[in-house]
């Protein structure tokens, strides 16, 4: 009876340690996957290079044109981040 008790206790301790080790290794793998380390030669400020103002105007005017087309209107004006569609319907 004592042998069975010690054997079960030993199995519980081993499984507990194994569980803790597996949890730590999985969390380390996940943290490496979601936040990869930057190489020392890369400036973090250069990671996300934004669009130039001209690019942003082109993108805005494209979105404006799509908006007007969805309303079945012609694009009237696209300046200073203001989108205006014509009153006439597209033929």
UniProtKB/Swiss-Prot annotation:
Signal sequence, start to end: 1-19
Disulfide bonds: 61-78, 64-83, 68-85
GO biological process: defense response to fungus; killing of cells of another organism
GO cellular component assignments: extracellular region
Principal subcellular localisation of the protein: secreted
Protein keywords: Antimicrobial, Disulfide bond, Fungicide, Plant defense, Secreted, Signal
Subcellular location: Secreted
Protein origin, superkingdom: Eukaryota
Family: Belongs to the DEFL family.
Protein name as it appears in the record: Defensin-like protein 220
Originating organism: Arabidopsis thaliana (Mouse-ear cress)
């Amino acid at each position: 009876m004592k042998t069975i008790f010690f054997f079960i206790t030993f199995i519980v301790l081993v499984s507990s340690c194994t569980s803790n080790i597996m949890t730590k290794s999985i969390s380390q793998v996940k943290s490496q996957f979601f936040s990869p380390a930057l190489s020392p030669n890369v400036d973090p400020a250069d990671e996300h290079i934004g669009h130039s103002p001209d690019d942003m105007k082109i993108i805005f005017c494209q979105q404006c044109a799509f908006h007007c087309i969805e309303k079945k209107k012609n694009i009237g004006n696209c300046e200073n981040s203001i989108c205006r569609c014509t009153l006439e319907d597209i033929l």
